[in-house]
Amino acid sequence: MQYLYIFVGGALGALIRFCLSMLNEGSTIPLGTFVANLLGAFLMGSIGALSLSLFKTHPNIKKGLTTGLLGALTTFSTFQFELVTLFNQHHFILFTIYGVTSYILGILSCYLGVKIGGRFS
């Protein structure tokens, strides 16, 4: 049964990811990946905090949300590829800003998600 939850979550995450990737069209800045990864970090923190109480009795829902939805939504490999592309195109300032802000804001988003999710658990 857990595979069904992961499958459905993955389909939803992939669809959201695809829609966000349209923000990248015609732009040097990979905004879609940036938004997807920050949103995913925030939601992972929230779900992680909520799982302490809410998902104890529903572990399949947690797997569907984390492994399925957020696994398909976020993408480390695309992020790395975009960084390499920016570097190869000699966009060194954008490369640095995108890399540094993605990591710092990703950690802060996850932290904020943990704090907010913890209030509801």
UniProtKB/Swiss-Prot annotation:
The gene is fluC1. Na(+) binds at G71, T74. It is a multi-pass membrane protein. Belongs to the fluoride channel Fluc/FEX (TC 1.A.43) family. Keywords: Cell membrane, Ion channel, Ion transport, Membrane, Metal-binding, Sodium, Transmembrane, Transmembrane helix, Transport. It catalyses: fluoride(in) = fluoride(out). GO terms for biological process: cellular detoxification of fluoride. Fluoride-specific ion channel. Important for reducing fluoride concentration in the cell, thus reducing its toxicity. This is Fluoride-specific ion channel FluC 1. GO terms for molecular function: fluoride channel activity; metal ion binding. The chain crosses the membrane at residues 3-23, 29-49, 67-87, 92-112.
